[in-house]
Amino acid sequence: MKKIGVLTSGGDAPGMNAAIRSVVRTGIYHGLDVVGIRRGYAGLIEGDFYLMDRGSVADIIQRGGTILLSARCEEFKTEEGRQKALKKMKEEGIEGLVVIGGDGSFRGAEKVSKELGIPAIGIPGTIDNDLACTDFTIGFDTAMNTIIDTINKIRDTATSHERTFVVETMGRRSGFLTLMAGLAGGAESILIPEIDFDLDDVSQKLKKGYERGKLHSIILVAEGVGDDFSTNRDINHSKAFVIGKQIAEKTGLETRVIILGHIQRGGSPTAMDRILASRMGSKAVELLLASESNKMVGYVNNKLVTCDISEALSKEKQVEKDVYKLANILSM
């Protein structure tokens, strides 16, 4: 193997640049040419490639986002689109591919490996932390700390005005980010897709808190909670606004709603995300050099591991209900 490609796909996550840096410099260390592919699978189809060197990734380890840019690509989901990508890769001489992204990105990597015959390795980069076969994904720790920092700021004004704040976080199908940020941020209530809840119970808990002398409350809500709430993504009809309105009606408490949105994806990655990305990027290159394909690099029990991408996609990562219980106990 003489030349490999690297791309980022799907939603960006802090630490992706650190992973790109690691792939490029590890590849060069092993005598490989490393080609950067801009805009994910769209760039793969269009041949938007450029040869990277050590200088290409200088001064990026601390930067959020991705220097390779990211985009969603419907065309790659078609056989015709994938054949275009294969033609471009063969013309460029790309013999292996590193894909940094979430589950959608990994489905593409699986197609590259199994259908197109190009070895591909996946690095989990998503703030949702919703991929199986790894304890942590790149970007999760940074996003969690961003939420916690925001909660701290919200508490200041919430206390001053004796208000309840409903704060919506990302997590359409997964509550990992919301749960862990809620536990670390001391949220009074945490609502996630995986665990049923009753707003009457939530409201009673809030009222009891105020009766004990609490001056404010923070309710953290994952964007994918309950079918009983509006699914219209217009900000004025967000589930968080529906929940906030119902809580205000049930409790009589002055309630405000905040949608954190894309702020959770930005910012300089934490040390943990930089280290995780650096280790995973290097491991991905080593796997390609060992003639591995259709594998994902994971991190389990403080060690790097590998698993089949198909296994990571087929398994559903479960939130720890003991952690959810602990968060409820500590918030009482």
From Swiss-Prot:
Metal-binding recorded as keyword: yes
GO molecular function, one term: metal ion binding
UniProt record similarity statement: Belongs to the phosphofructokinase type A (PFKA) family. ATP-dependent PFK group I subfamily. Prokaryotic clade 'B1' sub-subfamily.
Binding sites annotated in the UniProt record for ATP: 11, 72-73, 102-105
Gene Ontology annotations of biological process type: canonical glycolysis; fructose 1,6-bisphosphate metabolic process; fructose 6-phosphate metabolic process
Cofactors that this protein relies on: Mg(2+)
Keywords associated with the record: Allosteric enzyme, ATP-binding, Cytoplasm, Glycolysis, Kinase, Magnesium, Metal-binding, Nucleotide-binding, Transferase
Organism for this UniProt entry: Halothermothrix orenii (strain H 168 / OCM 544 / DSM 9562)
Subcellular location: Cytoplasm
Binding locations of substrate: 126-128, 163, 170-172, 223, 256, 262-265
One Gene Ontology cellular component: 6-phosphofructokinase complex
Any single Pfam family the record assigns to this protein: PFK
InterPro entries: ATP_PFK (IPR022953), ATP_PFK_prok-type (IPR012003), PFKA_ATP_prok (IPR012828), Phosphofructokinase_CS (IPR015912), Phosphofructokinase_dom (IPR000023), PKF_sf (IPR035966)
Protein name: ATP-dependent 6-phosphofructokinase
Record comment: activity regulation: Allosterically activated by ADP and other diphosphonucleosides, and allosterically inhibited by phosphoenolpyruvate.
Physiological role: Catalyzes the phosphorylation of D-fructose 6-phosphate to fructose 1,6-bisphosphate by ATP, the first committing step of glycolysis.
Residues annotated as binding ADP: 21-25, 155, 186-188, 212, 214-216
Subunit: Homotetramer.
The EC number(s) this enzyme carries: 2.7.1.11
